[in-house]
Curated annotation (Swiss-Prot):
The protein's name: NAD(P)H-quinone oxidoreductase subunit K
Gene this chain is encoded by: ndhK
Requisite cofactors: [4Fe-4S] cluster
GO molecular function, one term: NADH dehydrogenase (ubiquinone) activity
Subunit structure: NDH-1 can be composed of about 15 different subunits; different subcomplexes with different compositions have been identified which probably have different functions.
PANTHER family: NADH DEHYDROGENASE (PTHR11995), NADH DEHYDROGENASE [UBIQUINONE] IRON-SULFUR PROTEIN 7, MITOCHONDRIAL (PTHR11995:SF14)
The organism of origin for this protein: Microcystis aeruginosa (strain NIES-843 / IAM M-2473)
Note describing how the cofactor binds: Binds 1 [4Fe-4S] cluster.
C-alpha cells in the first residue's frame, strides 16, 4: 500500500514554512571547525600588516647605497618582502642609513627622521655608519656612530655589506615588529648608545708618500741621454738650475 499522501503533503508544507520563517539555517558544528576558524588578536593583525609593508626611504650618503640599490634590482628583488622605496619621509616608516654621516649631514638626517610618521625604524648599514669606519681615526667631520643622532634598531656591519646582509637585517626587523604591542604606538623609547668613541691605540708611522718624488731631478728635467737621443736642445732654464746645483 502507498503511504498516506496527506502526511507527506503536511511535511512538505512544514519544511517550506520553516524556510520562509528562518531563511538562514543554523550553523552545524563540524570536525573541520579548527581548520576554518582563525583566532588572533588585534596586536597580531596590526603587526602582520606593518611587517608585511615596510616602506624604506631612498637615502644614501656613500658607497653602501650602491649595495642597497642592487637590492632593488631583479636579482634580489626586495619587493617580495613588501618593501616599496619612497622618496618622501612622510610616506616611509623605515630609513636605512647607507654611508658615512658627516657633521654637515647630521641635522638633515635628524630632520628626515623627525618627519617620518610613527612607528618608524632605523637600520644602520655599514661600518662608517655604525662607528665611523676608516674615518674614525683621523677625520674631524665624520660622526662616530649614527646612534648618537637617532635610535637604531638593527646594525649591519661590513664595508660595504652585501645585499644578502640587508635582507637578513630586514628579516630581523620583521621579527622585532611582530613582538610589539599596539599600546606602545606613539611612545618614543629612548635607546642607549651601543657604540661610543674611544681613543685608538694605533701607532703613528711616517707616511710612505711624502711628495718628495715630485722634486726629483728626473721629474724636473728629462735625462741627458734622452735629450741627446731625441736631438732636443736643453732649455736654458734647466742649464742654469744644473749650474746652481753643481756650485
Amino acid at each position: 500500500m502507498s503511504p498516506n499522501p496527506t502526511s507527506e503533503f503536511k511535511q512538505i508544507i512544514e519544511q517550506q514554512s520553516e524556510k520562509i520563517l528562518n531563511p538562514i539555517e543554523r550553523t552545524k558544528v563540524t570536525q573541520d571547525l579548527s581548520e576554518n576558524v582563525i583566532l588572533t588578536t588585534v596586536d597580531d593583525l596590526y603587526n602582520w600588516a606593518r611587517l608585511s609593508s615596510l616602506w624604506p626611504m631612498l637615502y644614501g650618503t656613500a658607497c653602501c647605497f650602491i649595495e642597497f640599490a642592487a637590492l632593488i634590482g631583479s636579482r634580489f628583488d626586495f619587493d617580495r618582502f613588501g618593501l616599496v622605496p619612497r622618496s618622501s619621509p612622510r610616506q616611509a616608516d623605515l630609513i636605512i642609513t647607507a654611508g658615512t654621516i658627516t657633521m654637515k649631514m647630521a641635522p638633515a638626517l635628524v630632520r628626515l627622521y623627525e618627519e617620518m610618521p610613527e612607528p618608524k625604524y632605523v637600520i644602520a648599514m655599514g661600518a662608517c655608519t655604525i662607528t665611523g669606519g676608516m674615518f674614525s681615526s683621523d677625520s674631524t667631520t665624520a660622526v662616530r656612530g649614527v646612534d648618537k643622532l637617532i635610535p637604531v634598531d638593527v646594525y649591519i656591519p661590513g664595508c660595504p655589506p652585501r645585499p644578502e646582509a640587508i635582507i637578513d637585517a630586514i628579516i630581523k626587523l620583521r621579527k622585532k615588529v611582530a613582538n610589539e604591542s599596539i599600546q606602545e604606538r606613539g611612545t618614543v623609547l629612548q635607546q642607549t648608545n651601543r657604540y661610543y668613541s674611544t681613543t685608538h691605540k694605533m701607532q703613528a708611522t711616517e707616511p710612505i708618500l711624502t711628495g718628495k718624488y715630485l722634486q726629483s731631478a728626473t721629474r724636473q728635467a728629462p735625462p741627458k741621454e734622452l735629450l741627446e737621443a731625441t736631438g732636443m736642445p736643453v732649455p736654458p732654464a734647466l742649464l742654469t738650475t744644473k749650474q746652481k746645483e753643481e756650485i
